[in-house]
Each structure stands twice: as C-alpha cells, then as structure tokens.
Regions:
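Short hydrophobic alpha-helices and adjacent helix-cap/hinge residues
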Residues: 2-325
Length: 325
C-alpha cells in the first residue's frame, strides 16, 4: 500500500518543524527566562555609570538585553549604614540573582558573606586581584573579577609635558587612608626624576594645606580615596586658589585636574559582561581567570591649564582622548 503524495508532504513538514525546533533549542543559548544579575555599587559616580553602560554593551554583544532576556538589579550603597546594607542585600537575595557584580572591597566582602553560594565578579580594582586581595572573603572559589594596573609611569611622563619645570609632586591623603599604592607611585616618580612627598591632612584642613603648598611643590597628586572623592569640588576650588595643578588616575577628579589618565570603565564593564555570560552557560567561577584590562584614556583639561596660565603643547593634546575646553 503506497503513501500518498499529500501524506508524504505532511510528514516532511512535520519532520522539518521538529528539526528546526531542535536546532533552535541546541544552538540558541538564550533562554526565555530572563537571567537576573545583581550589580552592586559602593557609590554612584561617573566611573560606575560608565561601567554600567559598558556592562550592558558587553551583555548585548552576547545576545542579552535588559527588559527582554536580562534583568539587571542595580543597587547603589553610597552612604548606606551597615544595617541598611544588610537589609538591601537580603532583598537582592530574595530576587534569586544568577550572578553578582560588585565594586569596592568592603562591599564585596559583605556580599560574599551574604551570598555564600553565588558567583561574584569583583570589578574596578586598581591592581590585579590576588588571593591576598580577597583573603578575608569566606569562599574565594566563588569570586573572580576584572582589574587594571594604574599606569603611574605614563601619567607622570605625560604630566611632565604640560606642567612647567615639574620636579616636585605632593601626594595628599587623609589620616588612616586605605590607599595602598604609595610604593608604586614612588617608584614611578623615581623613574621619571620627580621628588615625591606625602602629606596626611585632616579633612577640615584640606584647603589650608593646599594653600600652604604654593611654592613648595609643582603639582598635587589626587589618589583614589573615598573621603577625598566626596570633596572633589572643594579640592578643585582650593587648587585654583593656590594656582597649583593636580593630576590623577581617577575620573572623579577630572574637572579639577589638568591631566587625568584612567582605566576606561566601559571596557571593564564589557569584560565583566562577557564573564557573566560564561557563568550563564555553566562556567565555574573557580576556573575563570581574573581578567586584566589594559585600555586607558587620557583627558587634558585645557580650560584649567589656561586658567593657571600654563602654555599648552599641541603635541600632548593630540594624544588626548578628551580635551576639556
């Protein structure tokens, strides 16, 4: 008994549909249920906002889009008390996030204590993450991250080209600062023939300290220190009043520095997004190597240079990714 042509066509169509569905299921990594990612910021600033933009870009390049198959749960812990921080983390835990992306060592440690079984991507770290970096975290097998080396050598070399007779540099820090890169900055200063001095000044005395440095130093270095970052506006005003140029490797000081040479936050965000997708697809955090971003950007503040009556070298401006006019 033969099979009719109509039946053969029907069977062929059914088989085609089955194969097509199977193909899509096997080769399309995107599942219908959104992947939920917790993004935890120690503070909201230009760096973290640009990092978040890069994170979204990195996830989108892998086929994950916010509001479709991706749910980013973004929390800002700026000025949060320990009690509020814990309450917020418990709320995030109830949302059953797949991956946690953190900034700030203290926040990362607290998060790891709260989410002992969740993968954590620790980001925006100004030096390569090592076992020592996270030795106080309970289960470091659940933590990987994205870091960068602050390019002090290159920063000082560029600064020498825009600051007249740049031979003396003063590092300002509040007492008991957690900043730990003095040795690397000191080595870079020695390499470039610059005398580095460090001053610890109480926060209420910042303006007076800067004004007293006029004629005693050629430039001020502003490090990554949360207490100083919160006072970036005050620092800028004091520096202009003292006619002293400042340099930094942190975006938060950009408007008050003649030169800012910084690790590009969008790139770090993209790398974090790529790592998150690997975890979505089953990668174990303990086998994911810590990534090191090596993409930096240079901002020259031409408007501030003019205000300080410094000559402007066009060749240096040509290197800048951004010129503030």
């Amino acid at each position: 008994m033969g099979i009719s042509k109509k039946s053969l066509i029907s069977v062929t169509l059914v088989l085609f549909l089955i194969v097509s569905i199977g193909f899509l299921y096997v080769f399309n990594p995107i599942q219908t249920k959104p992947k939920r990612v917790g993004v935890l910021f120690y503070q909201s600033n230009p760096t973290t906002l640009r990092f978040l933009a890069g994170l979204k870009t990195g996830l989108a390049k892998q086929g994950y889009y916010q509001g479709e198959n991706l749910d980013l749960v973004v929390e800002n812990f700026q000025n949060s008390t320990p009690k509020v921080t814990m309450a917020t983390l418990r709320k995030i835990a109830q949302k059953r996030v797949k991956v946690l992306i953190t900034t700030g060592k203290d926040l990362t440690i607290t998060t790891a204590h709260t989410f002992r079984d969740k993968p954590i991507i620790y980001t925006l770290v100004s030096r390569p993450i090592t076992k020592e970096t996270i030795q106080t975290i309970i289960d470091e097998k659940n933590i990987t991250g994205v870091s960068y080396f602050t390019p002090y050598d290159r920063t000082l070399e560029l600064a020498q080209r825009i600051i007249p007779h740049f031979k003396r540099l003063t590092l300002i820090l509040p007492p008991h600062s957690a900043w730990t890169d003095y040795k690397r900055l000191s080595e870079a200063a020695q390499k470039t023939g610059i005398q580095l001095n460090q001053i610890a000044t109480p926060l209420p005395d910042l303006e007076r300290t800067i004004l007293n440095l006029k004629g005693k130093t050629d430039a001020i270095f502003l490090p990554y220190d949360i207490q100083l970052i919160f006072r970036a506006g005050l620092l800028k005003a004091a520096l202009i009043k003292a006619s002293l140029p400042a340099i930094s490797n942190n975006l938060e000081y950009q408007s008050g520095c003649v030169l800012t040479y910084y690790a590009e936050p969008e790139t770090i965000g993209e790398i974090a997004g790529q790592m998150a997708v690997k975890i979505f697809h089953g990668a174990k955090v303990k086998y994911l190597p810590i990534e090191l971003s090596s993409y930096y950007k240079l901002t020259i503040n031409k408007a501030l240079l003019e205000k300080l009556n410094f000559s402007i070298h066009e060749d240096v401006l040509s290197y800048a990714n951004e010129v503030i006019r």
